[in-house]
């Protein structure tokens, strides 16, 4: 069984097609969306979406956050920012991770620490998408 998936960012439509399942990080944890899933509307945390297409091929897209809407035959991901794994720059992601770690070590106060932690989580998520995209090739 399959369903239709649309992944849309503020800039463009990143994916539109028939899929077997997706995996994404919601506000309450990891979500696996299979055909016939109960209707759902939830926030998406920064991380990745793993798409298993109709014939088993996988694609990985980095999401900076957004909204997931699940209906019986259609799933829509409205992302703040979405970047395909192939389009991510590994050197840039490593540099972002290094800067965020330095910021955490030098943070002064809760707001500084929270902001640095969020930046670190985004950098780690990008690196994970890059790693999984390389493995899938």
From Swiss-Prot:
| Organism classification | Bacteria, Pseudomonadati, Pseudomonadota, Gammaproteobacteria, Enterobacterales
Gene it is expressed from: atpC
- Family indicated by similarity: Belongs to the ATPase epsilon chain family.
| Membrane topology classification | Peripheral membrane protein
Q: How does it assemble?
A: F-type ATPases have 2 components, CF(1) - the catalytic core - and CF(0) - the membrane proton channel. CF(1) has five subunits: alpha(3), beta(3), gamma(1), delta(1), epsilon(1). CF(0) has three main subunits: a, b and c.
Q: Which residues form the signal peptide?
A: none
Q: What does this protein do?
A: Produces ATP from ADP in the presence of a proton gradient across the membrane.
Q: Where in the cell is it found?
A: Cell inner membrane
- Which PANTHER family does the annotation name? ATP SYNTHASE DELTA/EPSILON CHAIN, ATP SYNTHASE EPSILON CHAIN, CHLOROPLASTIC
**Where does this protein have coiled-coil stretches?**
none
Q: Name one Pfam family in it.
A: ATP-synt_DE
Q: What is this protein called?
A: ATP synthase epsilon chain
Keyword annotations for this protein, in alphabetical order, are: ATP synthesis, Cell inner membrane, Cell membrane, CF(1), Hydrogen ion transport, Ion transport, Membrane, Transport
Task: State the GO CC annotations.
Answer: plasma membrane; proton-transporting ATP synthase complex
Top-rank taxon, per record: Bacteria
> Where does this protein chiefly localize?
membrane
InterPro entries attached to this UniProt entry: ATP_F1_dsu/esu_C_sf, ATP_synth_F1_dsu/esu, ATP_synth_F1_dsu/esu_N, ATP_synth_F1_esu_C, ATPsynth_dsu/esu_N
Record-level Gene Ontology MF annotations: ATP binding; proton-transporting ATP synthase activity, rotational mechanism
């Amino acid at each position: 069984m399959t369903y239709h998936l649309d992944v849309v960012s503020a800039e463009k439509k990143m994916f539109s097609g028939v899929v077997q399942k997706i995996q994404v990080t919601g506000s309450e944890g990891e979500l696996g969306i299979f055909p016939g899933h109960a209707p759902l509307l939830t926030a998406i945390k920064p991380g990745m979406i793993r798409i298993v297409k109709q014939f088993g091929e996988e694609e990985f897209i980095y999401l900076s956050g957004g909204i997931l809407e699940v209906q019986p035959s259609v799933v829509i991901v409205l992302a703040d920012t979405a970047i395909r794994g192939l389009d991510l720059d590994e050197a840039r992601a490593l540099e972002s991770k290094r800067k965020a770690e330095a910021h955490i070590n030098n943070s002064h106060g809760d707001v500084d620490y929270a902001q640095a932690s969020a930046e670190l989580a985004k950098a780690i998520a990008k690196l994970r998408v890059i790693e999984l995209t390389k493995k899938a090739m």
